[in-house]
């Protein structure tokens, strides 16, 4: 998994 996906999931949460 890439790092960019980290904030993406955080925002979707």
UniProtKB/Swiss-Prot annotation:
Tissue-specificity statement: Expressed by the venom gland.
Transmembrane segments annotated in the record for this chain: none
GO molecular function annotation: toxin activity
Primary localization class, coarse: secreted
Keyword flag Nuclease: no
Location in or out of the cell: Secreted
Keyword Cytoplasm among UniProt keywords: no
Keywords, in A-Z order: Secreted, Toxin
Any single Gene Ontology cellular-component annotation: extracellular region
Family, per entry: Belongs to the cationic peptide 04 (cupiennin) family. 06 subfamily.
Name of the protein in question: Short cationic peptide-6c
Gene source species: Cupiennius salei
């Amino acid at each position: 998994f890439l790092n960019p996906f980290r904030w993406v999931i955080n925002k979707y949460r």
